[in-house]
């Protein structure tokens, strides 16, 4: 019998997701600047909404690029 491997969320439950934490937010963005989907990141639905909201806010404030300038 094969059991599905349970993925652990990269963010602990209840941990605040802040738009100023650029290093954390970069983990959820591709090289081209697109937000990674929930099935790849392993986040819960609530965490995914918070992360995408924080990424969008950081982009508007200039903390994250809309498109990666490297390459």
UniProtKB/Swiss-Prot annotation:
Gene3D superfamilies: Ribosomal protein S18
Cellular component terms (Gene Ontology): cytosolic small ribosomal subunit
Protein family according to the UniProt entry: Belongs to the bacterial ribosomal protein bS18 family.
Record's subunit section: Part of the 30S ribosomal subunit. Forms a tight heterodimer with protein bS6.
GO molecular function term, any single one: structural constituent of ribosome
Alphabetic keyword roster: Ribonucleoprotein, Ribosomal protein, RNA-binding, rRNA-binding
Pfam families: Ribosomal_S18
A GO biological process held by the record: translation
rRNA-binding keyword on record: yes
InterPro entries: Ribosomal_bS18 (IPR001648), Ribosomal_bS18_sf (IPR036870)
Presence of the UniProt keyword Nucleus in the record: no
Name of the gene this protein is made from: rpsR
SUPFAM superfamilies given in the database record: Ribosomal protein S18
Function text: Binds as a heterodimer with protein bS6 to the central domain of the 16S rRNA, where it helps stabilize the platform of the 30S subunit.
Species whose genome carries this gene: Synechococcus sp. (strain JA-3-3Ab)
Full protein name: Small ribosomal subunit protein bS18
């Amino acid at each position: 019998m094969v059991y599905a491997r349970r993925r652990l969320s990269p963010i602990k439950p209840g941990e605040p997701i802040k738009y100023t934490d650029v290093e954390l937010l970069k983990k959820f963005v591709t090289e081209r600047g697109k937000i990674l989907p929930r099935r790849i990141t392993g986040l819960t639905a609530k965490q995914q909404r918070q992360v995408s909201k924080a990424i969008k806010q950081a982009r508007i404030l200039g903390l994250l690029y809309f498109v990666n300038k490297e390459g």
